[in-house]
Amino acid sequence: ACGGFSYGDTLGAGLGWASSWRFNPLLRDMLGEFFARGNTFTLGVCNGCQMLAHLAPLIPGAEHWPAFKPNASDRYEARLSLVEIVPSPSLFTTGMQGSRLPVVVAHGEGRAVFASPDQAAAAHSVLRFVDHHGQATEAYPYNPNGSTQGINGLTTADGRVTIMMPHPERGFRYAQWSWSLGDVGEPSPWMQLWHNARRAVG
């Protein structure tokens, strides 16, 4: 699930989109059944991340996910930022843990806000913003939105549903990066997300 500014973000980022599922009994039941099936997986990026965060009550293992609020800068932030992929159950990031990679960010409401420190500690983080020393940070501009502990990607306890505010799909080839040591015609490390998804299909 991707997209951008669904319903104009009038009700809050992703809320209108999520509400179109939550308040339609037929669609809500269908979605609940989908997430309950063990042979499905889902990736939510940016507006898809915000939408799925609103649907967390329907997603097994997502009870510790945060809300996504307006950026601390009160501005739309669009540029490359540096993230670290942290150990998690996510099927999408298998084999990528420990990588520090540039990634495109393009959002106005990407600040992950947890209800409590305990909720943040219990959440299964997937990626976080880091500074030029590789340390998780809440400091601007390394962290473009001010997310708690730099967290900007999460997954469920079983790793089948993953959400993230950054856009790895906008940087899966080196040609999409601002600079690279690699051949610009080659896939970047972000391509591993899609290889992992393909393997999950079988």
Model features per residue range: what roles?
Residues 1-2:
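A structural preference for short, pocket-lining loop segments at secondary-structure junctions
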Residues 5-89:
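Cysteine-nucleophile active-site neighborhood
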Residues 28-35, 65-202:
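Amide-donor transfer/coupling interface in amidating biosynthetic enzymes
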